[in-house]
Regions:
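Cytosolic-side transmembrane-helix boundaries in multi-pass membrane proteins
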Residues: 150-157, 161-164, 217, 236-275
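Transmembrane helix-bundle core of multi-pass membrane transporters
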Residues: 70, 74, 81-138, 168, ...
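Membrane-interfacial amphipathic/re-entrant helices at transmembrane-helix boundaries
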Residues: 1, 37-43, 105, 111, ...
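Single conserved hydrophobic/aromatic residue that forms the stacking wall/gate
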Residues: 2-9, 13
Length: 275
């Protein structure tokens, strides 16, 4: 699940998009509300992804059409989504403990335990999302989006509408994050209006860890780095919890990891200069 979320963040973190802190719980809120009302949990996942997509479009319009700075556009959407999420759920949280989810239905269908289903479902979703991303960003449209991220002025000089490319990139990334929120809500057994707090830090930690370890010299390497970084991050979190770290300190620990990873190149450069 974190791999899918990180893949979305990997597409947007260089554009300073804060929408994820709102689109993640939006996906969970939509999915939980639909499931509680008797809808299919699989349909609820699609609806959660669509909700994230709409959130990304809003941020994209604020940034490209209204010329609001990227980070502020994301923050404004994130703040607005807090109220939207409350309206979607009708309250601060929704329990899913006594209803069918994608995990319980998969366990029943394949005659496996819930723990096995909790591994299989995210693994399949990760594969499908990664395959789609690899294919899409290899198309002409996808390469235009990637080029816009690298050098907006150069792409604009080629006659490409960069505003449209940015909006498409934002709604794809936030659709992935909304999908992840829908899956996490079903796995946790509840959706909460505050479940998105710290999402961007967790995702960034996964992306940065993967990039530091593998390096990024191609698009496929970038995909692999995100997946590897997510796995390593979760292993590290499991280890520090096993060693006795209070769960309340996890966000602080994650923030420190991100700071160290971002500062490492500068520190390394100063050390080399000193030598």
């Amino acid at each position: 699940r974190d791999d899918v979320e990180s893949r979305g963040l990997g597409d947007v973190y260089k554009r300073q998009d804060m929408t994820c802190e709102g689109s993640f719980p939006l996906g969970g809120a939509i999915a939980a509300s639909m499931i509680a009302a008797g809808a299919s949990p699989w349909l609820a996942i699609a609806a959660g992804a669509f909700g994230g997509l709409l959130a990304g479009i809003v941020t994209g319009i604020l940034y490209t059409k209204l010329k609001i700075p990227a980070i502020l556009a994301g923050i404004l959407t994130m703040i607005a989504l807090y109220s939207v999420n409350l309206h979607v759920m009708g309250k601060a949280n929704i329990s899913l403990l006594r209803v069918d989810t994608i995990f319980s239905t998969t366990a029943s269908l394949l005659h496996v335990s819930n723990s096995v289903a909790a591994f299989l479902v995210p693994a399949v979703l990760l594969f499908l999302c990664s395959a789609f991303i690899y294919w899409f960003f290899g198309t002409e449209l996808g390469m235009c989006i990637r080029a816009t991220g690298y050098n907006t002025q150069m792409v604009r000089a080629q006659g490409v509408n960069t505003d449209t490319m940015i909006i498409i990139g934002l709604f794809i990334s936030n659709a992935l994050i909304g999908l992840c929120g829908a899956v996490v809500a079903q796995n946790n057994g509840f959706a909460d209006v505050g479940m998105g707090i710290g999402t961007i830090i967790i995702g960034l930690a996964s992306v940065i860890i993967g990039e530091v370890i593998l390096g990024v010299d191609s698009f496929s390497a970038s995909l692999a780095a995100v997946i590897l970084g997510s796995v390593i991050y979760r292993v590290v979190i499991a280890v520090v919890l096993y060693m006795g770290m209070p769960p309340n300190d996890l966000k602080l620990f994650t923030a420190i990891i991100v700071v160290l990873a971002l500062a490492a190149p500068m520190i390394k450069g100063k050390v080399n200069v000193g030598k």
